[in-house]
Amino acid sequence: MSTPTKVALITGGDKGIGLETARQLGKLGIAVIIGARDSARGSAATAQLKGEGITAHFVQLDVTDQASVTAAAAKIGKDFGRLDILVNNAGVLDYGGEATPSTVPQDILRSTFDLNFFGLIAVTQAMLPLIRQSPAGRIVNLTS
């Protein structure tokens, strides 16, 4: 596979802000990789972007599963050899149904923190060797 000018991975890129970020990067001519834990939604988002003329690829990626993160980094390394842009977008806000911020059960707080914080760290650490292969690698962290 020939390597495009720039390659970007967007975690949680299958919907919402992640999908729109992928779309806007794709419109700039950047090859986008949709990272999503749900294969069906990730594949559908990738097909949608391809239908818009964007160079898009899908990689299964659950940021809370180290094996998934490692496999995604290996696939991106094999297919592209580098990563120019990492957008850490995957995240969740879960108050546990009717709970308020001051009454959220601790197990929900732990799973939220695992995804929103430790997931970001895991992906960043796994992708750093690929980002270092870029002449001007970038990491963007966002929450919503």
Which sequence ranges carry the predicted segments?
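Conserved glycine-rich Rossmann-like NAD(P)H-binding loop of the short-chain dehydrogenase/reductase
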Residues: 28-44
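A short, exposed helix-loop element centered on a Lys and neighboring polar residues
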Residues: 124-125
